[in-house]
Amino acid sequence: MILSLQCVSEPSPGGKWQTLFQKSWTAYKEWFLSEGLISRKGYLTSATMLQHYMPELLPLYEKLSELAGGGDMEARFLSMYCPPPYMSSCSQMAWSHDEVFLIRNYDYSPVLFEGIMLYTNYLKPVIGLSDCSWGLLDGMNADGLAASLAFGGRNICGEGFGIPLIIRYVLETCASTDDAIIKLTSIPSHMSYNVTLLDADGNYATVFVAPDKPPIVNHAAIATNHQENIDWPYYEDMTATRERISVLENYQNQIQETKESLTRKFLHPPLYSYNYQKNFGTLYTARYDIHERELHLVWPDDKKLMQSFANFKESKILVHLSGGNIKKEYL
């Protein structure tokens, strides 16, 4: 199975973003309508909620909607207000000892993965992995604030925004973990997610958001796919979230670790998953080196990709996703 990842630089919304949107819109439209048009919020409601909760993004949203063709359906999709449910299986850790970095494995379906890394300068410079055309799965801004999302393991969907857009908003408007916490705890999320934050001062937190209860600020450096309790046993069994959090707890206490040694550990099960058939295989390992303002993507086959704010290069990489014969590593 081949994973394609394209690195695209476009500081302001324009022709490159428009081309990417046009390529992905057929698939996104099918997903957006998967529960029927009546299940999705109307344009007026969606735009009003975006203006209320993330007003700084409104001019950008209007520009992107125009580039997307100016249609009602496209604008409703881009608002990311009350989208269909979706979930992933991820492991993430903020490290702030001698070195400061955020590392994560993103586990999802390779067929549904957008496969785009974007450098933008909308409200401030941001580098991240794209989802839903302008949302982010993880990313870092030029201030050195990094954020990463993991599904919270709760089979509940409510009224709120898709978490990738919330991640985009946080990185566009915040400079520190404290700033990000304020924003994260003030915006409704349509499903449960765990957002791990790390800033240039080494301050970290993981925020549990949910559609049916108040957010919880957890001053923890690690997260997998449950929150305070296991709410969905079937999902827990399928993704081994408790096993993975135990491994991360062990690693975070080993202060002799370096970013290179921890990165290698993230390339082994149970943190690294080969469960592609059930859409929970690891698609990439991302490490955000905060002080260097660099993003490193790595894979078990020794493929690597590095980008930075100082030298972002447009490129494309193909990765062969295979294996499953690599032993688990706990030490």
Segments (PLM) and residue ranges:
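Short, glycine/charge-rich beta-strand/loop segments that flank catalytic centers
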Residues: M73-A94
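C-terminal, well-structured catalytic/ligand-binding subdomain of enzymes
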Residues: M1-G70, M80-Y81, H97-D179, K183-S186, ...
